Each structure stands twice: as C-alpha cells, then as structure tokens.
Amino acid sequence: MGCFESKPDQQVQPVTVRSPTDIFWLVLYVVFWIALIVIAVFSFIYGNPLRIINGYDSFGNTCGVRSNDKFSNFPLSGMNTEDKPYLFFLDIKELRHTLKICVKECPQRELLNAAELYRYYEDRKTKLCRYDFNMSMLQTQEANQGAKYFDFNGPCPPFPVYQSAPVLHRCIPTGVNAPLQQVKKMYALINSWEATQQVFSDLYKAWPTIVLICALSLVFSIVMIALLHWLATIVSWLICIIVVVASVGITGVLWWSYYKAKHTLDTDQQLSYLEELVRNEATIYVLAIAATCIMIILLVVIYYLREKLTGLAALFEEAGKCMLQLPGLAGPPLLAFLALSVFLAFWVVVVVCLATANYPGVKPLLPLAQLEDSASIANDPKLKPELAGKNDTSFKSFKLVEYHDVNVLRHMLWIYIIGLIWTSEFIFACQQLAIAGAVAFWYFRKPTDSPVLLAIAKLVKYHLGSVAKGSLIITIFKIPRLILTYLYAKLKRHQQEGSECASCCLRCCICSFWLLEKFIRYLNHNAYTVIAIEGVNFCPAAKIAWNALVTNALQVATINGIGDFVLFLGKLAVASICGLISILLLRDNPDLHFYMAPVIIITVFAFFIAHIILSLYEMVVDTLFLCVCEDRTINGNSGRWKESNLARLLGEAPEEDAVEAPMQEVQLTPITKQPFSAQFLQAEMENSKA
C-alpha cells in the first residue's frame, strides 16, 4: 500500500498544482458500494422482519399486516390480517405439523366442545377455525357428535382449547389445565429461531425509540460543545463529574434491571422456558459487571489525573478562539452527522432484511376440503369440509406455505459488517480532513475567503481517494481486532482450566491488541492535516505527521493525550446517558425478544454521534498542536505559537501584546522541511478559486 515500504527518508516536495490523490482506492470504494447496493436490493426482495416478529400462518400470510403477497395455487394467501396480529396453533400436541392461523386474540378461556367454540366466536368475534370455514356448521348435531372437524389439520382445533396469552405474538397456553410438556415444547419452538433473526427483528420493532434517543444524543453532544466553549476554565472538571454520575447511574440501573429480571424468572417458572428472558438476564448481568469495572477504572484514572486537568483550560480556550473566528467549523460535523444517520438507518434496515431473508416453499399437501372444480374456497358460504378419501378424485388439496432461509444472503451480513466499519471511518475521515484543512489554513495563512469551504472543496475535488485508503487501512486492522476480542473471551475460559496452549494464545492475543492499537494510533487524523496542506497521498502524509509529532517535546504529547481523554469522557458521558434512557424505555416492552440488543445498538450509535460532534474540538486541538510543533521547530521564538495560549503548555509565557509576532512568510508551512514559496502560495490560491 505504500505505508509499509522501507525506503530511505526522502524530502516530499509540496505540489504547486493539486491533483487527485489515491485514485485507485476511490475506485475500489465505489465498487464496494455498488456491491452493497446490489445486496440491499436482494435483501429488500427476500427479507421481511415482520414474519419473525408476528409470525406467519400455514398459507403464507404474515399476521398483523394489511397486505400480504398473493401466491398462485395458494387460495388462502394474500389476505388482510391487520386485525389478526397473533399466531394460533390449532393443535399444540403437533406443533411442527399442525395448521397455523392468524387470530384477533388468543383464547381467553378454556373451550371444551363445538358449542363453546361457536359461543366464543359469537361473543368475542374471534374465529379459531380456518379462514374459509363456515362457523355455523358448529351448530349442527354432526359437529357436536363427530371429530372430523377437529383435527391438527383443521379446519377447527381439537379439544380442549386451552386459555392462552400472547408471547412474542404467539398464543401460548397459560391456564391451570395447560399441559406442562406441551407448553415447554411451544417455548422450545420459539427458542429454535436463530438468535440473529431475533436480535434484528427487535431492532426493527424498536426503531422509533432508536431514532428518538439518537436525536437526543445529538442534543447532548451540542450541549457538551457549548460547555467546552463557554466554560473552558472548569469544563474538564464538569465533564469528569458528568461522566462519573452517568456511569454510576447506568451501573445502578443495570444491577436493578438484573435483580428484576432474576426475580421475575424465579417467581414465574414458566417464563424460564423462554430463552430470550434467560439471555436478557445473563446479558444484563455481564453488562452490569462490565459497567462496574469501567466505573471503578474511570474513578481511579480521574483521581490520578486531577492535577493535570487544570492545565487544559488553555488548550480549550485556544481551540475556542479558533472556532470563534471560524464559525463555519460547525458545518462539517453536522454534515457528517446527517451522512452517518442516513447510513446507519440504511444499514440497520438492510441487515434486518438480510437476517430475515427467506422464500416461500411448499409443505406436504394436506387434503382438507372437498371442492368442486368451480368452487371457490374463499367465498363459498356453504362450504362443508370433509376429509378426503384416498382415491376420491373430486377432492382438491390445500398447499401449505413454509418459508426457507436464503443462506447466501445470510452470509452477506459479513460484507455489511465490513461496510459499517469502512463507511463510518470514511465519514469520520472526511469530517476530519475538512476541519484539519480549515484550521491549518487559518493558522498559517489566514485567507480572506472561507477556509472551511476551501477545505471541503479540496476534499471533494482531490482527496476522497486518500480518505478511502486511510479508512480502509483502519478497517483492515479493526476487523482482526473484533475477531481477537471474540477469541479473548473463548481463550480466557480455557486459561482458567489450566490450558498452557490457551494461555500462550491469550498472550499472543494481548500482544496483537497492543500492536494493532499502536498502528491504528499511528494512522490518526494528523495525516489528514498534512494532506489538506500539501496535497500528498495518505501514506507519505502519515509519515510526515508522525515525524513532526515525534520530534517535539514529550510534554506536548502528554497534554494532547489528556485533552483527548477528557473529550473521550465527554463522548462516554453522552453514550452512557443515552444507554440509561434506552434501558428505562425498553426493558418493559413485551414485544421484544432480547431488549438488550436495541440498548447496545443505541449506546453504540450515540457514541458514534457524540464522536462526530465532539471530534470537532478534538480535531481542532490536534491540528493546532501539529501546526504549533512545526511552527516552533522552524520559526523558533518568532513563530506565531508564542502569541497563543498553547505557549503555556510548552513551558513558555505567551506574548502579552496583541501584536502578531514577526514571521518569515516562506516558512509558515514547512511540514516537509521544504518551505512554501510566495509563488506557491499564489498558485495555491488561484487553484482553489478555479
């Protein structure tokens, strides 16, 4: 890729006329997105999360839906089931083979014979027989004396019909006479669904809450920016207090939620058969322990950094001064927020459809109705169901629908996971390059036109390829990091059993974490500052930025690191508050299989949004430090850095007068040790206007 080449250091000449950088990587990114769109189209065709959430009957109708697909040769398909949101199994003793229908409500009382079934239909207007069955047939003497209407194949359920309650839109017997073994089998049937389907169907069900809390995270992030700007002298302490309170709050709520979940399972033995509730309890327990550990670590770190927090006032004041003179800096974060919101919404919809992708198939035909060739199943009010004889050619057969998974599309989830990381990093990188370019132009040259618009124009016109390459490199090293995280959890269990091999692998895993973290940190957004100023490719820019920072005082890196840590605490505070709100809103929602899945997604999305907004300050600070490092190295005490508050962080007293210190114009931007000439500056300005 160019980043890994071992060559002697060469002076990188600044370009006088910019040209597009890293074009190949932009083409690769566009091709990747074309593949994502193609996969999305197929997911929309085959995916339907409501089939998992509400269930579907034996004729292919999804319960609780106004419009269902009409299949040829399936007479009872394509029905309007909007008023029938619950799935009812006619015979709970034959769950895998019995007829399933959508009903208005689950049976509210136990029904023992045909007369009670008809009376229930008259009282509750709830039909517990097949859609085409004439319920008046239950009043005949033949219906009360015979069992031919009451079978697992239908048209009506065999007796007794137990009192039931909806569990995840399925009617589960709850009456005192309900057979325990059959109830366990029904819960086992629900538990047999893939966990991935359940998780993504929960995301689909909770999308209004996800959107609401993500919008709140934007508001909280803007409030945090306002605090950084107007309360710079005490904002470090204020953020620490907020994050401590938020971490204590979410830890307390998690432990309280775990207590309630455990108490519910202990008091209602039947609920313990549902794996989703058990999984919720286990997940809350793990998250509560993790939140407790994080809270303790935060308290310890904040305690030991308390003396250094006061010195950050100068850092945030200087960043605030830059933002005050460049109000347009608020533009890139808002654009990035909109782009990320649209992408995350698109991503969630597609992965939900991918996880629920299936296609209709035909179950073994069940001869359920005696029909004339001209008869209509759906509209013949005199229909009298009879079980067909084996050799009777006047009988037609019902074709029952069963959906089968599209395994090829399921595997496409991995491509979308890569797409989530790469596209998110791409959006972050675009924002960072635009901000870095604007701040660098402001620091070195103070152009009369808008530096923000100039930086955005250069990004779109020249540097999208470099952004695509930089975000891909980070993605390549983040994916193994996720894999190693999974291996860490597995190997830790074997290490406790005394496995030397697992212990060795665990050490290698930790070492890999460290190396990957260092490499990703090396490819930080300082490279985008160099790209914005010099117009070079990503890898040379990363090398230049690294050398510029390494050759300067350790104190600069320390203060910069503490400043980034405080901003990270701000992002963590926003994510914690949003996670706390989501737990309170979703934990009592009966329609969710695994409510902790939306909570985790909301927390991650809130952190992403806070990262976009608060990275404005982070990028301004890091860019100013990079500019100050080069300014100090080349211009010494005559550099502009002497007049800023950052001089205190370098152990110097800032200039008291407001007169700008004399500077040599040809040495204003010497990041490559090749100072820009006046002719180059003039050409750059003309190029930006072109």
Swiss-Prot record:
Glycosylation sites: N134, N391
One Pfam family per UniProt: Choline_transpo
Mode of membrane association: Multi-pass membrane protein
Keyword hit for Transmembrane helix: yes
Sorted UniProt keywords: Glycoprotein, Membrane, Transmembrane, Transmembrane helix
Transmembrane regions listed in the UniProt entry: 23-43, 203-223, 237-259, 282-302, 334-354, 415-435, 464-484, 565-585, 594-614
Subcellular location: Membrane
GO BP field: transmembrane transport
Gene Ontology MF terms: transmembrane transporter activity
Cysteine disulfide partners in this protein: none
InterPro entries tied to this protein: Choline_transptr-like (IPR007603)
Gene Ontology CC: membrane
Keyword Transmembrane helix (UniProt): yes
Family listed: Belongs to the CTL (choline transporter-like) family.
Protein name (record): Choline transporter-like 1
